[in-house]
């Protein structure tokens, strides 16, 4: 199977609306000073992920589902890709560094704060 065919196949994997909304909420919750943003984001993050992050959470979820032999994307696919997708899109501030926080710590807390469904 060639790369182009795999690419087309990945894009055809269906995603439930609630999983899409979860990916969007996860990316949006990483942005400080937005409605519904967790307090720790406002305290420790200077810059959060944009909407493109949600798109890549879903696209990566499609590839992960296909590689796992599943025909649809799950919340766990999105959660598993949160760190690789969000890591370079979240900029922590000096307060976070002083508190010993890392981007990975922030993403872990974000996954706890943003509920599935």
Where are these regions (language model features)?
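Phosphate-sensing "switch" segment of ASCE/P-loop ATPases
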Residues: 1-35
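C-terminal engagement/docking regions of AAA+ P-loop ATPases
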Residues: 32-117
């Amino acid at each position: 199977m060639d790369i182009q065919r795999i690419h087309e196949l990945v894009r055809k994997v269906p995603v439930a609306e609630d999983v899409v909304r979860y990916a969007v909420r996860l990316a949006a919750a990483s942005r400080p000073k937005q409605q519904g943003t967790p307090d720790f984001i406002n305290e420790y993050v200077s810059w959060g992920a944009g909407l493109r992050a949600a798109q890549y959470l879903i696209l990566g979820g499609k590839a992960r589902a296909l590689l796992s032999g599943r025909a649809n994307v799950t919340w766990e696919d999105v959660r598993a890709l949160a760190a690789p997708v969000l890591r370079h899109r979240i900029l922590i501030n000096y307060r976070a560094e002083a508190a010993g926080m890392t981007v990975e710590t922030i993403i872990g807390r974000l996954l706890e704060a943003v509920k599935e469904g």
